[in-house]
């Protein structure tokens, strides 16, 4: 192996924790910006209140990640089982634009349900521009899509 990974069985929990902390910090800042931009009275709104709301939303979102992962697993399975040309699950994950669109949607939908302004639509529009598939973050799509 040319480049040895520092991640091992012994360090995976540490690395995951660091990444989750980074996600929480970055997402909190973006949610804060979205909340401020959406609130036309934000000039008079206490910064601490919006900051606390953004952090709470980010934390709640992070706790939904296992649920999102589970839904995506059913989506991969459904796509693989429904397409005789699919060689394996990895091909569906890495090569199918529909999976990219549904992945972005699943993340955006959770943020949408949490009341985050702007960001969910931006996430689905990223997939739309890359794949041509437009899914509104408020759409209700069950498992095995």
Model-derived regions: residue spans:
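Short loop/turn and capping residues at structural boundaries
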Residues: 122, 138-139
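Terminal amphipathic alpha-helical/low-complexity segments used for targeting or macromolecular assembly
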Residues: 1-125
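A structural motif detector for beta-strand N-caps
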Residues: 127, 133, 139-145
